[in-house]
């Protein structure tokens, strides 16, 4: 399953995604699903907003099956095309924990504007499980924070 690609990530169930994005009356999100053989193999959530004279597009969330060659490329190109057609001058996203995707974003001329340290604390977990967690397999996007507006 797609969610098993990471040690730690938000559970992206249908109920959660509807609560987080589609049932929000205060913000308009654009949701895209990607299929292969009639099965969802990825999705992305976009938002646009105006700040001063700039219209920005945010790729709020992107989740995909890493085993499908070029799926991430297709998602990002499709998202950029959609945002461009909707008059966005800049595109931003946060992506923590997927180095392959970050490398591909660099090839698409995205650049790192700032970084945020990943800080974690063990609460109720066996020590051996905690030691086996790999910070590079903690997956976070802009949609996993409270900072989206």
Where are the regions a protein language model picked out?
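Amide-forming acyltransferase catalytic core, primarily the GNAT-like/NAT-type
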Residues: 1-58
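Active-site/acyl-donor-binding loops of N-acyltransferases
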Residues: 30, 36, 45-70, 74-149
């Amino acid at each position: 399953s797609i969610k098993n690609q990471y040690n730690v990530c938000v559970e992206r169930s249908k109920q959660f995604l509807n609560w987080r994005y589609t049932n929000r009356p205060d913000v308009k999100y654009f949701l895209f699903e990607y299929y292969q053989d009639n099965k969802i193999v990825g999705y992305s959530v976009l938002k646009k907003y105006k700040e001063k004279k700039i219209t920005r597009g945010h790729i709020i969330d992107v989740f995909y099956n890493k085993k499908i060659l070029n799926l991430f490329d297709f998602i990002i190109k499709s998202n950029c095309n959609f945002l461009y057609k909707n008059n966005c001058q800049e595109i931003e996203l946060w992506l923590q924990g997927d180095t392959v995707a970050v490398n591909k974003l660099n090839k698409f001329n995205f650049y790192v504007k700032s970084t945020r340290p990943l800080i974690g604390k063990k609460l109720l977990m066996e020590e051996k499980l905690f030691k086996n967690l790999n910070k590079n397999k903690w997956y976070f996007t802009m949609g996993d924070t409270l900072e989206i507006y």
